Structures are given as structure tokens and as C-alpha cells.
């Protein structure tokens, strides 16, 4: 019994020692905080408002980082800052009567008050600023620079026009993408073009030729490549021929000589050929579906491997081939 009374009195004494500290607690503090009792009163949070007093008028010393211990050590341990008597807590505006909340509605963000401290250099009198004067009323030096830039711009345009003309001349000597095989495809054959006036010379000289713009294309021809001859006067395809040389330029300058320019051929993109098979010419309806067309009735002269093999198959179906055709590699 005496032990129980002694323990009771010890408990009551401890309770009296803590009474003064408990009296200083507010609703914004946790009584279960481990370090709350060890803090002095001026270090603890106190949102109590005295009549005629200021809200949060006290000034803290060094910022603390303890959980829920004072204004400086708030729930997120945000540092204390005083900006126009507005304490920034939890990233919001000044702390109100309810510790930063006003009937459950957050106050305006602190960054909304930045315009109180930052001068945007706006002239309320409506006078034009320096930047506006430079934009709408340039000085004489700026006008002079603009004229010089305009002059240089005209010179650049003239240079660009010259370059475009040179590029146009270069394109004239080469084939556009629509008339040539893609770069990742291997050339499998070639169709040369003639008419009734030039066909006899093609066969007699065993030389095929095309206009200058086909020079680069014809250079891709190698010996043994299947060749075909299209007569656009009769719209027939003749075959089968084989390249006997590499494609080149002016292999025989006297062939199809240009009367206006003696010693130069009208069809300088040339290759020597041999006849592999003499066949009946093919009509357009039999071979045109195989070819790649562009710009309506025009077809590509460069053949890929499937197109070349398909043309050889059509000629083979006529059963007019000889032993030379049998030796043609597939």
C-alpha cells in the first residue's frame, strides 16, 4: 500500500513539473514530439494573437530542421523568410490566423508577390522606351546598315541564281530519280532507243548511243549486260543484244555525227554490242507492263534484274533462240 502511495506521489510530482510546459502548447504542435519539451518557449511555435499585437511578430534565429517544432522547422522543414511581413510556409503566402490556412483555402502563392519587389520598367506615363524607339524609329546608322545588308543580300541572290543555273546545267547532263534505278538496286539490263533513221547505223556499227544526259547512266554498263533496242517509230522492242564493252562517252565520235559540230556525236553516251539472239520484235502490249513508267507513256531505260529476266523470258517464248542464247548466264 505504501509502495502504491509513493509511486502515486512521484507521478503527481512529475506531472506538476510538466504542467508549465504543457500549458504553452498550441494546436499546431504535437505533444508527442520528442524534442518539444527540451525547447525554450521563444523557440517554439506560437500563433496566439494578442489584442493590438502583430501576427507572428516574433523573429526566429537560426533556421531549424526538426519536424513540426517551429515556424522555421515546418512540416517540410522550409526555411523562414520574411518578405514584406509575409512568412513563406509550405510554398504558400503569408501565414494567416489558422496557421497558413483560411477556411480550408490556400492563400496565394508567394511567387505571385514577386511583382512587389521587381520593377518591370513599365512607364505609366506612356512615354516610349528606348527599345521601342530602336524598333519603330531606327537611327541613321541602323538605316545605313540595313541598306548595306540589302545590297549584300542582292549580291547573294545573284550568286544563288548563278549556282542554280550551274546546277540546272549539271542536272541536264544526268538523269532525275524518276528515270534512274534506286541506288540500292543493281542494274540488270538496259534499253537503248532509236528510230527508223538511226536503227540501221546501230546494227551496222554494232554500237548503241544515247543523248548526252545519259552519259552517267550508260557508264554503269559492264560487258555481258543484256541490252535491248527500242524503235519509237514502230513502237517495237528488238533483241537480244549483249554489251561488248564498258559504257563510255564518244567511243566512236563519227557515229551519228553532228553536222553542226563536226567530230562530235549527237549520241555520245555509247557502248559496243554483239547480237546474242535474233528475234521477232516485241509489241508494246507484251513488254510495257514489265517496265517502270513515269510521266505517262515514258518508261525507264535502266532495268533492274527482275525486269531484264522478264524480257528475256518473253523473247525465249518465241522459240527462235539459238545456241548463243543458251550460253547467256541467268
Curated annotation (Swiss-Prot):
Where primarily located? cytoplasm
Q: What induces it?
A: Induced by tunicamycin, azetidine-2-carboxylate (AZC) and osmotic stress. Induced by dithiothreitol (DTT). Induced by wounding.
Q: Name one GO cellular component term.
A: cytoplasm
Please list the GO biological process terms of this entry.
response to endoplasmic reticulum stress; response to water deprivation
Native source species:
Glycine max (Soybean)
Something else known: Over expression of NRP in protoplasts induces caspase-3-like activity and promotes extensive DNA fragmentation. Transient expression of NRP in planta causes leaf yellowing, chlorophyll loss, malondialdehyde production, ethylene accumulation, and induction of the senescence marker gene CP1.
State what protein this is by name: DCD domain-containing protein NRP-B
| Gene from which the chain derives | NRP-B
- The residue ranges flagged as biased composition, category Basic and acidic residues, are 160-172
* Keyword field: Cytoplasm, Stress response
Look up keyword Zinc-finger and say if it applies.
Answer: no
Which segments carry the region annotation Disordered?
Answer: 137-181
Tell me the ranges covered by the DCD domain, including all copies: 185-317
Q: Which Pfam families match?
A: Dev_Cell_Death
Q: Which PANTHER family match?
A: DCD DOMAIN-CONTAINING PROTEIN NRP-B, PTHR46034
Q: Which InterPro entries match?
A: Dev_and_cell_death_domain, NRP-like
Amino acid at each position: 500500500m505504501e509502495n502504491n502511495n509513493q509511486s502515486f506521489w512521484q507521478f503527481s510530482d512529475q506531472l506538476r513539473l510538466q504542467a508549465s510546459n504543457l500549458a504553452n502548447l498550441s494546436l499546431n504542435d504535437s505533444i508527442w514530439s520528442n524534442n518539444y519539451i527540451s525547447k525554450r518557449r521563444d523557440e517554439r511555435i506560437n500563433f496566439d494573437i494578442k489584442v493590438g499585437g502583430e501576427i507572428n511578430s516574433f523573429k526566429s534565429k537560426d533556421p531549424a530542421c526538426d519536424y513540426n517544432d517551429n515556424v522555421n522547422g515546418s512540416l517540410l522543414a522550409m526555411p523562414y523568410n520574411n518578405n514584406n511581413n509575409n512568412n513563406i510556409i509550405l510554398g504558400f503566402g503569408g501565414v494567416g490566423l489558422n496557421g497558413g490556412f483560411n477556411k480550408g483555402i490556400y492563400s496565394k502563392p508567394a511567387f505571385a508577390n514577386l511583382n512587389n519587389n521587381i520593377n518591370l520598367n513599365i512607364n505609366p506615363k506612356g512615354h516610349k522606351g528606348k527599345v521601342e524607339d530602336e524598333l519603330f524609329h531606327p537611327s541613321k546608322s541602323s538605316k545605313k546598315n540595313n541598306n548595306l545588308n540589302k545590297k549584300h543580300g542582292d549580291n547573294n541572290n545573284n550568286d544563288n541564281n548563278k549556282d542554280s543555273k550551274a546546277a540546272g546545267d549539271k542536272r541536264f547532263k544526268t538523269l532525275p530519280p524518276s528515270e534512274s534505278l534506286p541506288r540500292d538496286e543493281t542494274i540488270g539490263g538496259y534499253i537503248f532507243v532509236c528510230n527508223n533513221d538511226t536503227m540501221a547505223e546501230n546494227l551496222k556499227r554494232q554500237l548503241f548511243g544515247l543523248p548526252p544526259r545519259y552519259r552517267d547512266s550508260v557508264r554503269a554498263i559492264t560487258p555481258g549486260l543484256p541490252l535491248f533496242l527500242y524503235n519509237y517509230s514502230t513502237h517495237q522492242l528488238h533483241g537480244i543484244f549483249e554489251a561488248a564493252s564498258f559504257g563510255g562517252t564518244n567511243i566512236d565520235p563519227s557515229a551519228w555525227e553532228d553536222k553542226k559540230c563536226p567530230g562530235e556525236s549527237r549520241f555520245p553516251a555509247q557502248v559496243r554490242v554483239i547480237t546474242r539472239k535474233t528475234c521477232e520484235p516485241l509489241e508494246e502490249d507484251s513488254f510495257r507492263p514489265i517496265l517502270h513508267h513515269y510521266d505517262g507513256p515514258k518508261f525507264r531505260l535502266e532495268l533492274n534484274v527482275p525486269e531484264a529476266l522478264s524480257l528475256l523470258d518473253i523473247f525465249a517464248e518465241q522459240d527462235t533462240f539459238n545456241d548463243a542464247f543458251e550460253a547467256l548466264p541467268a
